[in-house]
């Protein structure tokens, strides 16, 4: 963009600021405003004035008026993690034996407490004492399937959140049939899966990659809006928040959606990363049952941020994916609500438009 065009665009941003017309704030609009202020206010002043308080005061006013206009809280995700650490919800995980230990540890790391019970005879008692249930379809057998259905009903009776992680649902007819039975008999607060798993739930089709997402279906900037629409339609159909995981995570209910960026490609080389996110999601939903969509976005953002940090350390120390797995749990243990708020990279969409952008 030429300087003249940038100046004109910034002038429009300043006019909107003065008239309090902003309903969207993005990094781009802020940069345009900064550029305009440089030309109009400071270009005619001594260079030293560029370092005075007037400049940041203008930006503080810009942000303050935006918050006043939209009425949105500055801290959206911070309080959700803080609630998990303060309330320490007890979460039952009916999960797979491949990732059970990691799921338990990351639940502890975020501040919640896990119970890894898949005993049908305990379902009623567990639903009384636990705050939420995570159902993971990773390793199945008929006994575990019966427990899933019974436990889900028990939690529904007590109005406690139930999470579905349909691992590899498109890999076999048995998995598809069980997923259909679960969705018929249980009201889920959130459903989490990669794009192939979510599409299989919607269409009833099969996938060729087992528990892994088909790379041809990956969420990208080009298809992001269409996948948001798909997630919102599925959310409307099921009444659940839909969390689609990938390079860009999508958390959606019937009217709003978060696009959460971050993470690292090495996370796909760690068995159980998706299962850990499912346990994390159950903990966030259990501690924040009235903010289901925000809880899903916060869980995804926390996992992405901790994954980035763990992978950076792996590269720095020339380590491997097993070390990265341990550091991922360590980073979750160390993560504060303030760090999550500052480090989260996301946009919030309403009616197809970005209303909050945090990068």
PLM features per residue range, with description:
Residues 305-359:
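Charged C-terminal helix
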Residues 41, 59, 70-116:
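Glycine-rich phosphate/adenosyl-contacting loop at the front of the ribokinase-like
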Residues 264-281, 292:
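Short glycine/threonine-rich catalytic loop with a Thr-x-Gly-x-Asp
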Residues 175-257:
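Conserved phosphate/ATP/ADP-binding segment of small-molecule kinases
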Residues 110-157:
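Active-site cofactor/substrate anionic-group-binding motifs, chiefly glycine-
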Residues 155, 159-184, 190:
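Glycine/small-residue-rich loop that forms an oxyanion/phosphate-binding "nest" at active or ligand-binding sites
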Residues 281-323:
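Conserved post-catalytic alpha-helical subdomain immediately downstream of the catalytic base
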């Amino acid at each position: 963009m030429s300087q003249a065009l940038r100046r004109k665009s910034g002038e429009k941003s300043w006019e909107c600021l003065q008239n309090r017309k902003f309903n969207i704030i993005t990094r781009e609009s802020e940069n345009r405003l900064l550029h305009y202020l440089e030309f109009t206010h400071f270009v005619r002043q001594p260079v030293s004035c560029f370092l005075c308080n007037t400049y940041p005061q203008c930006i503080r006013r810009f942000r303050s008026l935006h918050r006043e206009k939209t009425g949105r809280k500055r801290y959206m995700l911070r309080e959700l993690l803080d609630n998990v650490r303060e309330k320490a919800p007890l979460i039952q995980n009916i999960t797979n034996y491949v990732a059970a230990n990691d799921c338990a540890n990351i639940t502890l790391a975020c501040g919640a407490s896990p119970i890894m019970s898949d005993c049908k005879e305990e379902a009623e008692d567990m639903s009384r004492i636990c705050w939420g249930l995570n159902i993971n379809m990773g390793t199945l057998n008929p006994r575990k399937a019966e427990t899933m259905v019974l436990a889900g009903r028990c939690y529904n009776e007590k109005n406690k959140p139930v999470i579905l992680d349909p691992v590899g649902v498109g890999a076999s007819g048995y998995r598809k049939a069980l997923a259909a039975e679960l969705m018929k008999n249980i009201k889920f607060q959130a459903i989490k899966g990669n794009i192939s798993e979510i599409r299989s739930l919607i269409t009833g089709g099969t996938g060729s990659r087992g528990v892994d997402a088909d790379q041809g279906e990956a969420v990208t900037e080009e298809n992001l809006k269409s996948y948001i629409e798909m997630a919102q339609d599925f959310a409307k159909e099921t009444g659940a928040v839909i969390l689609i995981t990938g390079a860009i995570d999508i958390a959606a209910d019937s009217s709003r959606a978060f696009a959460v960026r971050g993470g690292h490609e090495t996370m796909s080389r760690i068995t159980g990363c998706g299962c850990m996110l499912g346990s994390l999601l159950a903990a966030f939903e259990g501690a924040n049952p009235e903010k289901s969509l925000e809880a899903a976005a916060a869980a995804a953002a926390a996992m992405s941020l901790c994954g980035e940090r763990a992978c950076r350390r792996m590269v720095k120390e020339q380590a491997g994916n097993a070390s990265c797995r341990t550091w991922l749990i360590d980073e979750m243990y160390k993560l504060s609500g303030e760090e999550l708020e500052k480090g989260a990279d996301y946009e919030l969409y309403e009616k197809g438009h970005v209303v909050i952008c945090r990068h």
